[in-house]
Amino acid sequence: MDYEFLRDVTGQVIVRFSMGHEVIGHWINEELKGDFNLLDRIEAGAAEVKGSERQWQLEGHEYTLLMDGEEVMIRANLLEFEGEEMEEGMNYYDEESLSFCGVEDFLQVLKAYRSFMLKY
C-alpha cells in the first residue's frame, strides 16, 4: 500500500494511494479533510476494538469506515445497488469504491497524515 501526501495550489492536502487502495485516499480527502478531532475519534475507536471481536463504524457523507480488531474496510455509501438488474456479462467497477487494509497499517497512514498536516 503506497501513498503520498501533496498540497495543491490552494494549500489543501491531497492524499493519493496505489491501485487497490485508492478509496482510502478518497476517504481521507472527502471525509477526514484535516479534522484532528475526527482523527482522535478514529484512533480511540481502534483502541476500543483492539483485541476484541467488536466493530467500530464511522459513517460519513460519501464513505463508511468499518473497523474491527484486525482489519479496516472503507466503502462508498453508494456501493450497494439494490434491485437493479445487470445485463448478462456486465458488472459494476468498484475498485475505487471499496478497500481493505490492516488496522496497524491504517493507523500508520493516519499518523503520517497528521504529521504531514502539522509539518507542511
Swiss-Prot record:
Pfam families: UPF0231. Signal peptide: none annotated. InterPro entries: UPF0231. Belongs to the UPF0231 family. NCBIfam families: PRK05248.1-1, PRK05248.1-3. HAMAP family: UPF0231. This is UPF0231 protein Spro_4007. It comes from Serratia proteamaculans (strain 568).
